[in-house]
Structure formats: structure tokens, C-alpha cells
């Protein structure tokens, strides 16, 4: 069994900052999400992470056709779609922190079935807020050395 030794290295460039969120949570972010995120945020996430555009949209539960319509229309996601993208950003930042800033390892972990999640992938849990909380709670348990 491998032993996890946490380091307290803080990400110098978290995803939430890269995509232009004022913070990772709070009333200002909530107002931005309710207004609708610009569709260009998907490109920013893709450039920062190792996830492709299709993967990001799938994980966020946004159909490619809806994305295409948003691109040719107002250029913004709906409030609901924006919340789902923010959920992905939040969880991905926590996963990258878990792996001490290694985005590749975090992405691999997100795609692997995890025992602590009932042998489903963390990315598949992001379709609901409670699933995302389960993933973030698992990350917290791992960071604190609680076997999951």
C-alpha cells in the first residue's frame, strides 16, 4: 500500500483564477454565474487542463449542439450551465492541489474508478452538486490521510 504524504504546496495558478473568476466562491462569483459565463471559458479550461473541449462539455453536462448555439448566439452559457462549469473548475482545482500541482495526475485520477466513490470515476460524479461534494470530501479525506 502506498502512503500519501501531503505537502502544503499551494497552486500558483489555480484554474478559477485562470478562467477569470473573482474567487473560488462567494456572492460576486454567484452573480457572475447567474449572469452566464462566456463560452470562451471552455477554451481557457482546455488550455489550462489536459481535458479536451468535448470532455469538458460532457463532464459539465452540456451538449455540443447547445454549446454551438451559445457560440453563435449571445456567446454566454445559461445560469445552470455556468453553475455546472464552475462545479468542474472547483473540483479540478481541488484535485490538482491533491497532486501537488500536477494537472496530468489530477486528470488521470478524475478518469479512474475510485473505491471511495463506489468504484465510479470522480468526473462522472460531477453531474450533480451532491456528487461533486462527495468528490471534494474524498479529496479532503485523502489529504488528511484517511483511507478511502
UniProtKB/Swiss-Prot annotation:
Pfam families: Xre-like-HTH, Xre_MbcA_ParS_C. InterPro entries: Antitox_Xre, Xre-like_HTH, Xre/MbcA/ParS-like_toxin-bd. GO terms for molecular function: DNA binding. Keywords: Toxin-antitoxin system. The keyword DNA-binding does not apply. The keyword Protease does not apply. Homodimer. Forms a complex with cognate toxin Rse. Antitoxin component of a type II toxin-antitoxin (TA) system. Neutralizes the NAD(+) depleting activity of cognate toxin Res. Belongs to the MbcA/ParS/Xre antitoxin family. This is Antitoxin Xre. The gene is xre.
